[in-house]
Amino acid sequence: MELTPRLAAVAALVPACHCMADIGTDHAYVPMDLVRKHRVEHAVASDIHKGPLDIARRHIGENRLSRWIETRLGGGLETLQPGECEGVVIAGMG
């Protein structure tokens, strides 16, 4: 899986860290890329809508990344505990 130029630019802005969150993940491409490249150890992929989150879960499972990427249903940063992730991506919403 290769990221689009826009998503690659977004991913390049995420610093190496233990945990990052992709809010409004849609398909989970950014967290999958960052985990594969060992830029993050763990990722949270969240979306407010079940349909896109189901797609993200499928992509994560097909790529055998479920051990490192957790999916959560919810809006915005409410899916995270305070201090849980050092980096957050909020891109392509709206």
Features from the language model and the residues they span:
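Conserved SAM-binding loop of SAM-dependent methyltransferases across substrates and taxa
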Residues: H27-V40
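Conserved SAM-binding motif I beta-strand of class I
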Residues: H42-D47
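Conserved class I S-adenosyl-L-methionine
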Residues: C17-D26
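A short SAM/SAH-binding and catalytic strip from SAM-dependent methyltransferases
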Residues: L77, C85-G94
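S-adenosyl-L-methionine
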Residues: M1-H18, M32-D33, D54-G83
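Conserved SAM/SAH-binding beta-strand->alpha-helix loop
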Residues: H49-G51
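Conserved acidic residues
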Residues: H18, E41, E86-G87
